[in-house]
């Protein structure tokens, strides 16, 4: 699962926040992952590796590339049996057409239903509800920003996905972000791009 503090799945939140030692490999501490923590996660009980350095508690060791660290750790645990088994996530599906207002969960259900009928499509999500909704969508290629300061990312990112891959993307974008960059859709006609844009 994905840790999102009190906004995430309770069992994931409990696992992370009650851990005696967190291993954070390539994790960028931001408002979308640790900003809604109910408990304070302290560097004293974490080993963090990113940006070419490793921090253990309050100590920092530079010039340790993440790829080299992971390769060395994999080599040291080779042949050991994992103590815990993961479980397959259950993504919401089966959208019911009714008179109730549309919620982000309904959007995730609709996209998951579409994927089951037509196959997976790449996904570009903006920040906020769009990003959190994307976490309830079946695993597919996803581009999304990590900070609220990147509002407006979704539409241009979706166009970039189609330009780079030739595949039709789904874009999840909020109404404010759409006002900022939605006009970029005017560039779709000459190259023949056809993203599906869902405005929250």
What spans do the regions from the language model cover?
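Glycine-rich, acidic loop regions that bind phosphate or pyrophosphate groups
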Residues: 1-87
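Active-site diphosphate/adenylate-binding microenvironment
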Residues: 86-166
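Thiamine diphosphate
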Residues: 1, 57, 67-70, 132-200
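Structural motif
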Residues: 21, 122, 168-170
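Short beta-strand segments
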Residues: 24-26, 50, 126, 172-173, ...
